[in-house]
UniProtKB/Swiss-Prot annotation:
<dbReference type="Pfam" id="PF00574">
    <property type="entry name" value="CLP_protease"/>
</dbReference>
<keyword id="KW-0720">Serine protease</keyword>
<dbReference type="InterPro" id="IPR029045">
    <property type="entry name" value="ClpP/crotonase-like_dom_sf"/>
</dbReference>
<comment type="subunit">
    <text>Fourteen ClpP subunits assemble into 2 heptameric rings which stack back to back to give a disk-like structure with a central cavity, resembling the structure of eukaryotic proteasomes.</text>
</comment>
<dbReference type="InterPro" id="IPR001907">
    <property type="entry name" value="ClpP"/>
</dbReference>
<keyword id="KW-0645">Protease</keyword>
<dbReference type="GO" id="GO:0004176">
    <property type="term" value="F:ATP-dependent peptidase activity"/>
</dbReference>
<keyword id="KW-0963">Cytoplasm</keyword>
<comment type="similarity">
    <text>Belongs to the peptidase S14 family.</text>
</comment>
<dbReference type="GO" id="GO:0005737">
    <property type="term" value="C:cytoplasm"/>
</dbReference>
<dbReference type="InterPro" id="IPR018215">
    <property type="entry name" value="ClpP_Ser_AS"/>
</dbReference>
<keyword id="KW-0378">Hydrolase</keyword>
<comment type="function">
    <text>Cleaves peptides in various proteins in a process that requires ATP hydrolysis. Has a chymotrypsin-like activity. Plays a major role in the degradation of misfolded proteins.</text>
</comment>
<dbReference type="InterPro" id="IPR023562">
    <property type="entry name" value="ClpP/TepA"/>
</dbReference>
<dbReference type="GO" id="GO:0009368">
    <property type="term" value="C:endopeptidase Clp complex"/>
</dbReference>
<feature type="active site">
    <location>
        <position position="135"/>
    </location>
</feature>
<dbReference type="GO" id="GO:0006515">
    <property type="term" value="P:protein quality control for misfolded or incompletely synthesized proteins"/>
</dbReference>
Length: 214
C-alpha cells in the first residue's frame, strides 16, 4: 500500500528487494512487502509506534475489503513499543471479519507479545528459535505531584486492561497474568505455547497454514 514500503525502506537503511512479475501487459515490479501483501501477509517489524500502527491498521482494513472471508497472516518481529499504538492494532484485529493468524519470527516482546497472542484461536504460531517476552507497562512522568499521581493512575488502569486482554487470550486469570508480568518474563517458543500465548511451534511449512505460491 502507498507509504508502507517507504517505512520499510527507512527501517532497512534503504535495502529492500524488488520482485519482477511478467503480466499480459509486460513486466511489473513490486517491493517485496507489497508483493507479499497481495498474498495477504502483513509484516509487523520493529518498534510498535503510531506511524507503524497506522500502516498495519490500514493494511488490515484493505485486506478485509478485498476479501472478508479469507484469513490474513501477521508476521511479527518486534521488541514492542507504545501501548496505545499496540492497542490500535489489537482492536482492529478483533474488529475485522477475517481471521488474523499470527506468527512470531525472531521476537515478540511487550506490546508485540500481546498482538501475537491476539491471533485467531488455533492460528497463533512461533518459529522454533523465536523469543517472547511479557511484562507490565512502563511509565515515567515528570511534573507536578498531582500530574504524576494522575499518570500513575492511568498506568495502573492500562496495566489492568492489558492483563484482562492477555488473560482472555491465554485462558489464565488476570491475577496470574499480573504476577507473571511483575518483571520481564522471557519465554522460548515452547514455553510460550505452554503458557497459552501461541497454539503451535512451527518446524515445517506444511503444517503452518501459511503456504503461498511464492
Amino acid at each position: 500500500m502507498p507509504g508502507y514500503s517507504d517505512n520499510i525502506i527507512r527501517n532497512a537503511s534503504g535495502l529492500i528487494p524488488m520482485v519482477i512479475e511478467q503480466t499480459s501487459r509486460g513486466e511489473r515490479s513490486y517491493d517485496i512487502y507489497s508483493r507479499l501483501l497481495k498474498e495477504r501477509i502483513i509484516f509487523l517489524l520493529g518498534e510498535v509506534e503510531d506511524h507503524m500502527a497506522n500502516l498495519v491498521v490500514a493494511q488490515l482494513l484493505f485486506l478485509e475489503s478485498e476479501n472478508p472471508e479469507k484469513d490474513i497472516s501477521l508476521y511479527i518481529n518486534s521488541p514492542g513499543g507504545v501501548v496505545t499504538a499496540g492497542l490500535a492494532i489489537y482492536d482492529t484485529m478483533q474488529f475485522i471479519k477475517p481471521d488474523v493468524s499470527t506468527l512470531c519470527i525472531g521476537q515478540a516482546a511487550s506490546a508485540a507479545a500481546l498482538l501475537l497472542c491476539a491471533g485467531a484461536d488455533g492460528k497463533r504460531f512461533c518459529l522454533p528459535n523465536s523469543r517472547v517476552m511479557i511484562h507490565q507497562p512502563l511509565g515515567g512522568y515528570r511534573g507536578q505531584a498531582t500530574d504524576i499521581e494522575i499518570h500513575a493512575r492511568e498506568t495502573l488502569a492500562v496495566r489492568e486492561r492489558l492483563n484482562n486482554i492477555m488473560a482472555k487470550h491465554t485462558k489464565k486469570t488476570p491475577d496470574q497474568i499480573m504476577r507473571d508480568t511483575e518483571r520481564d518474563n522471557f519465554m522460548s517458543a515452547t514455553q510460550a505455547m505452554e503458557y497459552g500465548l501461541i497454539d503451535k511451534v512451527l518446524y515445517d511449512r506444511q503444517i503452518a497454514g501459511h503456504s503461498t505460491d511464492l
